[in-house]
From Swiss-Prot:
Family annotation (Gene3D superfamilies): 2.20.25.10
HAMAP family reported for this sequence: UPF0434
One of the record's GO cellular component terms: cytosol
Source species of the chain: Nitrobacter hamburgensis (strain DSM 10229 / NCIMB 13809 / X14)
Family: Belongs to the UPF0434 family.
SUPFAM superfamilies from the UniProt entry: Trm112p-like
UniProt-listed InterPro entries: Trm112-like
Protein name (Swiss-Prot/TrEMBL): UPF0434 protein Nham_0083
């Protein structure tokens, strides 16, 4: 039996995170588990993760400081 924290949508696979890059800068991304976002510091964008799927569209990203 799985607990809510064991669900795959609560995290991002490390291998996937190694492969994914920011579509704007082609730079690395950081996983923010609390907000369920992938952060591009160079583009100052936060890409949402919905139901365990990273949404890598710049128009869907949140601008960050």
């Amino acid at each position: 039996m799985t607990t809510p924290s064991d669900r795959p949508e609560d995290t991002v696979d490390r291998k996937l995170l190694e492969i994914l890059v920011c579509p704007v800068t082609k730079g690395p991304l950081e996983f923010d588990g609390a907000r369920q976002e992938l952060i591009s510091r160079s583009a100052k964008l936060a890409y949402p993760i919905r139901e365990g799927i990273p949404i890598m569209l710049p128009e869907e990203a949140r601008k960050i400081e």
